[in-house]
């Protein structure tokens, strides 16, 4: 299978070729701890843990730049035909979290330099950085260790170094960018059963008018790969 992106690393940076067919598709961006020099860090994280939930993102571009969008997944308005919807939309535009200069463009793809994006902490994604930083960052220690590209995901191992208050702190973070299916999974309302984590959402209703709070359970979409569907249906 063809990789999701094509990566080229050299002395000038880490260049990512992104197919235009993936523009405006939904992605999840996440980061977890691979190694730490000590678990006695500011947020008390161990290897294998993450601090933040994965973040929903989209990509878009114009003639000069590629943009990373952070849609709001917790405030919804489903009735787009209502007369009041334009007023809601004016107060719910999608913010831009990152932008990059387009280094090269073809009919089917664009190329950007993601060196800084991949090798530095991303606010609200990386477990160490900003308010959760173990100490003063040591940029000379921040570097990309490994990049793996698959059909539907990008996996990057990154090293971060910090001065620390009493001793130096070194960590390796695994950043993941996952391409989501074009057809979203059917959500399920949370109930009182034990064992489910849930995500709160607010739904705007113009007819009432009101704002309804709803909780949806978090669950995994576990389905067979296309090549294994027949075996799955046969119970193998």
Walk through the language-model features, giving the residues of each.
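Auxiliary tRNA-acceptor-end handling modules of aminoacyl-tRNA synthetases
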Residues: 1-236
């Amino acid at each position: 299978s063809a990789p999701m992106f094509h990566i080229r690393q050299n002395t000038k940076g880490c260049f990512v070729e992104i197919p235009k067919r993936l523009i405006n598709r939904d992605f999840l961006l996440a980061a977890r701890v691979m190694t730490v020099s000590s678990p006695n860090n500011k947020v008390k994280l161990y290897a294998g843990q993450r601090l933040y939930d994965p973040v929903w993102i989209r990509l878009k571009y114009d003639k000069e730049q590629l943009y990373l969008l952070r849609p709001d997944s917790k405030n919804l308005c489903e009735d787009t035909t209502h007369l009041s919807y334009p007023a809601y939309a004016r107060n719910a535009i999608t913010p831009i979290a990152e932008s990059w200069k387009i280094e090269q463009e073809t009919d089917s793809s664009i190329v950007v330099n993601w060196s800084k994006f991949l090798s530095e902490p991303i606010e609200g994604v990386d477990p160490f950085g900003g308010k959760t930083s173990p100490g003063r960052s040591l940029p000379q220690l921040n570097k990309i260790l490994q990049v793996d590209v698959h059909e539907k995901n990008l996996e990057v191992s990154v090293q971060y170094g910090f001065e620390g208050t009493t001793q130096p702190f070194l960590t390796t973070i695994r950043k993941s960018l996952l391409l989501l299916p074009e057809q979203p999974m059917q959500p399920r309302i949370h109930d009182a059963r034990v064992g489910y984590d849930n995500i709160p959402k607010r739904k705007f209703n113009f007819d009432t008018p009101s704002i309804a709070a709803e909780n949806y359970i978090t669950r995994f979409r576990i389905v067979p790969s296309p090549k294994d569907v027949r075996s799955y249906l046969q119970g193998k």
